[in-house]
Amino acid sequence: MERNEYVVWISTRRIKPGTYEDFRRAWRPKDFPEGMLRAYECVAGETNEVVGISIWDSLESRETYRLSSIEAERRQAMAPFVETESSGVYVGRELQIPKD
């Protein structure tokens, strides 16, 4: 990766109606992993769709976490509330927005 580039992991889950609060408790990690720089939770209101966006310092950090027992436990805790899931990993950079 080049300087000023980050690894972005985006996961989208459609959850069962009425389970958002339970899902959210299961989804939040017990400890935030080394290498995770930022994390966002986005909810698409009435569609029961939750998008997680995490920013990582390297592909290795993200992969280490993905394969960890903490992530396995978290995924197992979320499973009863999830109908569908998809995810992708991207390398990106922050765009500088001009300020007038």
Please place each PLM-identified region on the residue numbering:
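Short S/T/G/P-rich N-terminal loop/turn motif that feeds into the first structured element of a domain
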Residues: 1-72, 77-100
